[in-house]
């Protein structure tokens, strides 16, 4: 299983152009044939292309060096060298490409099949046939190929999912994503079952919605406690937030307050995202009463109740996801 990655550095290089050829025609009855050195092939380009089934940057290692192929040298009989193969780097939708040294954003690839040439390969050198003139009938020189270019890039995913499930440890996030998608997010009765985001796809009438089961948040996450900053960074890259609150516990309002406060401290802008409050574990004793209290207290929020085991509210919740995502 690949580790989840939504940011990494790559060092990419385009290919060198091939050298031009110094050659002279040598055929029977043509002892002093003219120059016939062909041009070098161009170096390969570096191309970034969006691939629809990618969700993370896990195909690559942080700091990995990737290079396009060099062009081949020219040959006699005016034959050009072969062009170098392009380097195609596949990335998920919503990938931003930065110059890692200047921190400037160079490109943003949002949609399936978007592509961009980040570096052009070096031009091939001209063969000596190009330098023949009335005063230079036998040029014994050719151009070298142009060198390729190198860039230190940083890739970042600006959006990792349509919906991010947020909650305290053991709120039931992993069970929910397993219920509504084909994901099999690890489910167990201990904190921090989810340590990296897990993804699932909800499909309704040929429309897909990406759901992320994000690591559980605890009080102090905005100060780096627990999975802290990594968790909160992932939250910022989802379109819709779902606060999952265990209403079988009488501390349900405390759970809500912790979630709101940690987001506010880390980045108050996160509170402007679309969100749904989901009361989980309605099948347990006392949960329905707590759910009704939660709806009353949070009367201005979208509040839904679910039971994964009794299949209560699941279809309504999925419909709400699609409504908010406007898919």
Curated annotation (Swiss-Prot):
Highest taxon in the source lineage: Bacteria
Cofactor(s) needed by this chain: Mg(2+)
Annotated Obg domain residues: 2-160
Listed EC numbers: 3.6.5.-
Location relative to the cell: Cytoplasm
GO CC, one annotated term: cytoplasm
Role: An essential GTPase which binds GTP, GDP and possibly (p)ppGpp with moderate affinity, with high nucleotide exchange rates and a fairly low GTP hydrolysis rate. Plays a role in control of the cell cycle, stress response, ribosome biogenesis and in those bacteria that undergo differentiation, in morphogenesis control.
Identification of the protein by name: GTPase Obg
Organism: Borrelia recurrentis (strain A1)
Origin organism lineage: Bacteria, Pseudomonadati, Spirochaetota, Spirochaetia, Spirochaetales
